[in-house]
Amino acid sequence: MNFKYIVAVSFLIASAYARSEENDEQSLSQRDVLEEESLREIRGIGAKILGGVKTALKGALKELASTYVNGKRTAEDHEVMKRLEAVMRDLDSLDYPEEAAERETRGFNQEEIANLFTKKEKRILGPVISTIGGVLGGLLKNLG
């Protein structure tokens, strides 16, 4: 009789262990799904914030450009306009990264393309901020 109890208890333990393993796998996959959904939400919020900043920045740059167009332009003003146009092109390439990447990366292999994207992000943000600072400083200098 002891043998029957040992077999029955062993079977119960094995089935309980199998159920716990299955539950662990399900909870891990559910956790992965929840983490992925959280990341998507965070990326969505970041994209909305970045979109708002880009829109505001574009509006400010267009206003600055129209100010320079209406007045007399010196060589320095002409350089500032060129920089503003370059910044506007870079901002437009942020809005449509696939098209810009397609134009810039024809003939590159995948690793070079990945490196180009990270370099482009760094290349765009630095000059955009410095150009905007320079333009605003120049405007304040001219107004003051």
UniProtKB/Swiss-Prot annotation:
One of its GO terms (cellular component) is extracellular region. It comes from the Eukaryota. Residues 1-18 form the signal peptide. It is found in: Secreted. GO terms for biological process: defense response to bacterium; defense response to fungus; killing of cells of another organism. The keyword Signal applies. This is Maximins 7/H1.
